[in-house]
């Protein structure tokens, strides 16, 4: 469990540190710093919703929902007997990211985003779209953790075959 909580703390620390930098250098100043022209920039944005800026509930409900999900993930990891790195890492990334964004909701009433990949901006079917949202370290940790759970699902949660049956192919 030391590994789990170390990763959670690392994600929260990196997330909050980089958000503090974004607040200091991007919010009241230049708003955006181009790193790679037409591809990658640090661009300040405030997100009152969830992923991709979707607003489906008031901020208080989002905070409570995030808190409940985080507690459920923590409880699952603590009560699980699996202590492998492959099991702990994705759940630690998801937990750390969730807590990082919860801190923002409590402190600012919104989540600070600043990482932007300009993959496509333009019209699709007559409607202007920006293909990729502005996001942060916490969002990245949550996404990587969720992808790891999907990719390694069969290793993490092996299906138990009913007794007395064989796998004939």
From Swiss-Prot:
Catalytic activity, as annotated: Release of signal peptides from bacterial membrane prolipoproteins. Hydrolyzes -Xaa-Yaa-Zaa-|-(S,diacylglyceryl)Cys-, in which Xaa is hydrophobic (preferably Leu), and Yaa (Ala or Ser) and Zaa (Gly or Ala) have small, neutral side chains
UniProt entry keywords in alphabetical sequence: Aspartyl protease, Cell inner membrane, Cell membrane, Hydrolase, Membrane, Protease, Transmembrane, Transmembrane helix
First-listed, main subcellular location of the protein, grouped into a coarse class: membrane
Catalytic residues (positions): 113, 139
Membrane topology of this protein: Multi-pass membrane protein
Recorded metabolic or biological pathway in which this protein acts: Protein modification; lipoprotein biosynthesis (signal peptide cleavage)
GO biological process: proteolysis
EC number in record: 3.4.23.36
Gene Ontology cellular component annotations, sorted alphabetically: plasma membrane
UniProt record similarity statement: Belongs to the peptidase A8 family.
NCBIfam families: lspA, PRK14787.1
Function (record text): This protein specifically catalyzes the removal of signal peptides from prolipoproteins.
Pfam families: Peptidase_A8 (PF01252)
Name used for this protein in its record: Lipoprotein signal peptidase
Transmembrane segments: 59-79, 84-104, 132-152
UniProt subcellular location: Cell inner membrane
């Amino acid at each position: 469990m030391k590994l789990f909580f170390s990763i959670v703390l690392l994600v929260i620390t990196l997330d909050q540190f980089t958000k503090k930098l974004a607040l200091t250098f991007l919010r009241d100043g230049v708003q955006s710093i181009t790193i790679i022209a037409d591809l990658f920039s640090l661009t300040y944005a405030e997100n009152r919703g969830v992923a991709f800026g979707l607003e489906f509930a008031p901020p208080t409900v989002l905070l409570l929902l995030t808190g409940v999900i985080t507690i459920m993930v923590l409880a699952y990891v603590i009560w699980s007997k699996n202590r492998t790195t492959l099991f702990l890492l994705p759940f630690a990334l998801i937990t750390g990211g969730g807590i990082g964004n919860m801190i923002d909701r409590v402190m600012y009433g919104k989540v600070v985003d600043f990482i932007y990949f300009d993959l496509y901006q333009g019209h699709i079917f007559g409607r202007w779209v920006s293909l990729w949202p502005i996001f942060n370290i916490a969002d990245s940790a949550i996404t990587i953790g969720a992808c790891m759970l999907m990719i390694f699902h069969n290793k993490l949660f092996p299906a138990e075959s009913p007794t007395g049956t064989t796998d004939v192919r």
